[in-house]
Amino acid sequence: MAGDESRSNPFSRRTLLRTSAAAGAGLGVAGLSTGYGAAQPVRPAKGESMMGVAFEAHETVRVGIIGVGNRGASMLPLFLAVPGVAITAVCDVSADAVNRAARAVTDAGHPEPAKYSAGEDDFENLLRRDDVDFAYVATPWEWHTPMALSAMRNGKHVGVECPAGTTVDELWELVDTSEKTRRHCIQLENCSYSQNEMRVLRMVHDGLFGQVLFGAGAYLHDLRELLFSKTYYAGQWRRAWHTGLNGDLYPTHGLGPVAAYMDINRGDRLVRITSMSTPAAGLAQYREQHMPAGDPTWNERYVKGDATISLIQTEAGRVVQLAHDVSNPRPYSRLNQLQGTNGVFEDYPARIYLEPTHSNDEWGDFAEFADYDHWLWKEVGPGPGGHGGMDYIMLYRLAQTMRLGLPPDIDVYDSATWSAPFALSVESVRRNSAPVDFPDFTRGRWQTPHPGVDSPKPA
């Protein structure tokens, strides 16, 4: 957990064995046994739909944090800053990390949380507590689904860092368990709460872009130094994924906002994906330039193509482009593009062109549309913390929905849908970029209107 939870190489334990065996059987990481592009079956429901289901109201939202490394430790003070939130328990396999987290809570003037660090399964004891309403999971990816499932089975709502799951089977299990236990499972996608993304979303819903046709999202972030750091990702777990799978390993930052623009699972749905990857070159080159002879990294073979590009089509015929590259030198970007019949928005840097306001092929100033900022940004944001304030806005809104007894903005169907390109892109790349169908995690309810990220201000 320390450094996002101190786990050993995920491919030395469960993940590589599972995914490699599946691929060898012609199933791929997505667990698909059907032919290219064949429709995926809808699984029988284990309970009633969780769409639009409200939280029970909480006077205080009591949070248990699993994983207090880089991400978890950075989010801890933001939870404490949100009105009506208390941290009652923290867990990590590193006792030092747990003690630091507990001290941060008490230093902020709050009671000391219960501490769990007795091995990699001690999170189960945290989840059995009766003073935890919401479990926050900030651990290596292979633990997201098991921990979320345990949380729900122990009666806790759960929020998971990206992605919610790494296989289609995992995602279906999250959906099934949420429906069966009546507990919410939320992909904590902070980028959905970024100021620009929320402003564009308001403009879409006010009709400024006309008919929405195309969107693009990405995770383009030079992580080479961090991936090879001996301390940042404890156990160097994140680089290990590049030795096992070739696809878009971090789709939700780009897809979550674009899915909101297109009302995915609220009138439209993702139907199929086609993905392709470049050669894997960047990490090997970085290793050659920076790692000494004899370093254990020289035993690694990187199979994850540096750039993975995916095209997704929706039921309404719209197209989404996703991109992922963490292995090459470049400025940070999530692309965040939207094209409609009335104009276009492109981010990094933010610029806009809308008829009839703009003309002569000259970009307009996006700041001129500040009146369309979401009410969360007008009245709450940016708040403390990094990432431009979107982390705090996300946690504020989460706690608000739990305290007032409202439905969450992001439900288990969104969480599964946004995370699915992880597995589906790997399968498409393995099949020489053949189309692979998206499961309908909503079981046919994707046209049902229900609350989303563009939430109205509570009365």
UniProtKB/Swiss-Prot annotation:
Keywords: Glycosidase, Hydrolase, NAD, Signal
GO molecular function, one term: hydrolase activity, acting on glycosyl bonds
Cofactors (names): NAD(+)
Region of interest: Disordered: 440-459
Residues where NAD(+) binds: 70-71, 92, 141-144, 161-162, 190, 250
Enzyme class at the top of the EC tree: hydrolase
EC nos: 3.2.1.-
Record field: transmembrane: none
Cofactor binding notes: Binds 1 NAD(+) per subunit. The NAD(+) cannot dissociate.
Residues noted as binding substrate in the record, renumbered to the chain: 219, 238, 250-253, 332
Disulfide bonds: none
Tagged with keyword Cell inner membrane: no
Description of post-translational modifications: Predicted to be exported by the Tat system. The position of the signal peptide cleavage has not been experimentally proven.
Signal peptide, first to last residue: 1-45
InterPro entries on file: Gfo/Idh/MocA-like_OxRdtase_N (IPR000683), Gfo/Idh/MocA_oxidrdct_glycsds (IPR050463), Glyco_hydro_109_C (IPR049303), NAD(P)-bd_dom_sf (IPR036291), TAT_signal (IPR006311)
PANTHER family, per the entry: BCDNA.GH03377, GLYCOSYL HYDROLASE FAMILY 109 PROTEIN
Family to which the UniProt record says this protein belongs: Belongs to the Gfo/Idh/MocA family. Glycosyl hydrolase 109 subfamily.
Role this protein plays: Glycosidase.
Protein name: Glycosyl hydrolase family 109 protein
Organism of this sequence: Saccharopolyspora erythraea (strain ATCC 11635 / DSM 40517 / JCM 4748 / NBRC 13426 / NCIMB 8594 / NRRL 2338)
Phylogenetic placement of the source organism: Bacteria, Bacillati, Actinomycetota, Actinomycetes, Pseudonocardiales
